[in-house]
Amino acid sequence: MRDLAALLLFLILAGSTWPVPWCPRARSSPAAERDGIPAIDSPRFLPAKAAGDLKPKDQVLGLRLNGQAKAYPIAILNWHEIVNDRFGDTPVAVTYCPLCGTGMAIRAEAGGQPLKFGVSGLLYNSDVLLYDRQGESLWSQIGRRAISGPHKGQRLEAIPLEHTTWADWRARRPDTLVLSRDTGQARDYDRNPYAGYDQERGLYFPVRFKAQGYHPKERVLGLESDGRFKAYPFAELAKTGGEVRDRTGNRSVAVRFDAEHGNARAADSNGEPLPGVVGFWFAWYAFHPDTLVYKAKPR
C-alpha cells in the first residue's frame, strides 16, 4: 500500500509544477498514512486563566483576527499539525510543521469555497503537505500553493501569526482563548516527540536546496513582498536593538525581535502586521534559494 502511495505521489508531482524531492514520512510509521497524524476539526478553547497546564516559557502560536485572540500550544500542534478553526465567519487553518519549525495561518477557502484540511502523510522539502477534504488537492504548507488536484496552482491567503511564549502572548492578549488538550485523541501532550531535533544539524528527510551560512535549524523570520523573499535570522536580529527598519521588495517593513521570548514579527509602514513565517533556516532556503538575507550592521 505504501509503495502504491509513493508511486501515486510520483505521478502527481510529475504533472505538477514542483520537482522532487518529495517523500512519504517514515514508511514504518502511522504518520506516513493519510490522517495518520489527525488534524483537529472541532477545536475546544479555554480562557487563559483556565490553562493551568501551560507554563510561561511554553511555545504557542498566537493569532488575532476579527476581534478574537487565540493561542495554539506547540505541545498540541506537535501531535496534530493542523487545526481547522473559525474566527467569526472566516474559516482559518492554523498549521505547524515540526520538521521545519514553521507555523502558519491561512484563510481556508479557495474559489469562494471553504476548505478543511488534513495531514496527507507526505512531505515536500521536509515540509508537510496538506490535503483538502473537499477536492483532495495537495497543498504545500510553506508555499501555500496547491500542487495537484482541482485547485492546482491556486494559492491560499496568509494571515499574520506569531510564534512566541505563552507568557508573552498572554501579557499582550489577556483576553486570549487557548486551545484545549481535550482534542478527542489520546496523545501525551507532555511529551515532545521531536525533542532535541531543533538542536541537531541533521535532517530526517531530503531537501532540494541545502542552506549555508547558518546552523540548519537557526530560526529565521521569512517575509515575502512582490515575489521577492527575505530572511531575518534570529542570530542577526540579536545583534540589533530589537527593532529593524528595512525594505522587502518594494515595501518598507519594521521587524521587532524579542530575544527573551524568541519572537520576531513584522509590520508595514502603517504599523499593520505583515504575514511572515518563523521557521528553520534550512526550510526557508529550501523553498526560496534566491532569498535575500538580512545582515546586522556593526553597532
Annotated model-derived regions:
Residues 2-26:
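Bacterial Sec-dependent signal peptides at the C-terminal "C-region" and cleavage site
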Residues 17-299:
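Mid-to-C-terminal functional-domain signal that highlights helix-capping/loop sites
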